[in-house]
Amino acid sequence: MLIIETLPLLRQQIRRLRMEGKRVALVPTMGNLHDGHMKLVDEAKARADVVVVSIFVNPMQFDRPEDLARYPRTLQEDCEKLNKRKVDLVFAPSVKEIYPNGTETHTYVDVPGLSTMLEGASRPGHFRGVSTIVSKLFNLVQPDIACFGEKDFQQLALIRKMVADMGFDIEIVGVPIMRAKDGLALSSRNGYLTAEQRKIAPGLYKVLSSIADKLQVGERDLDEIITIAGQELNEKGFRADDIQIRDADTLLEVSETSKRAVILVAAWLGDARLIDNKMVELA
């Protein structure tokens, strides 16, 4: 497994792979890898000849400096996991390599609408940072496919739109959420939970499933469903942050013509902001 930290070396390897006619898959990550990331890697391996995993804690997508400072950097452990998975290439650049003149004056990519709604409304600049780094990685790696987790539902929708709008010839693969046995969605942020909070955390998925059950039996008073769900989260020990029921195909409000809904939930548990989602077919 090659570990590359500089743009010239990465370009050299990508040129070689292209000359050999290899099909390349990219898995962009911020490191601190868990089994959910490994599922992305496995999906990439099944679809391509060569798998490139990027590990870069992107300062442009953090709206709070303290979040950036405390985000775990576990490069050695991450590379050991990826080596066991027989990943071909890890791209682990420094911030200086990606943003030589800092983030403030760096050219950015913005996806109107999707970047400022829902999660974007409560985290200004976050999705602009995501779309900028992902488009830069697409330019550098030139993958045939790229794999992203469905846990970050809005992020996946944003990347699909960016790819369509910018004409990237890249297949975007959404990989289903991986969960612990008790239902908690795997996330790097779960590491912020205390042992006691970890026992409470599966309650998020229980509330999510409860909302889904109501929608599936035909309940359509969305405001009431959301209010009750917020109360349930708070009673379980969470601090409900945002609960949305949206059209899964547009992320706009659910309408009479909506075929599928997505339930998006964000809640604080101690110092961890947990997010999850669930799709529901609307009868």
Swiss-Prot record:
Beta-alanine binds at residue 61. InterPro entries: Cyt_trans-like (IPR004821), Pantoate_ligase (IPR003721), Pantoate_ligase_C (IPR042176), Rossmann-like_a/b/a_fold (IPR014729). It is found in: Cytoplasm. Its EC number is 6.3.2.1. Pfam families: Pantoate_ligase. Keywords: ATP-binding, Cytoplasm, Ligase, Nucleotide-binding, Pantothenate biosynthesis. The active site is at residue 37. GO terms for biological process: pantothenate biosynthetic process. One of its GO terms (molecular function) is ATP binding. ATP binds at residues 30-37, 149-152, 186-189. Homodimer. HAMAP family: PanC (MF_00158). This is Pantothenate synthetase.
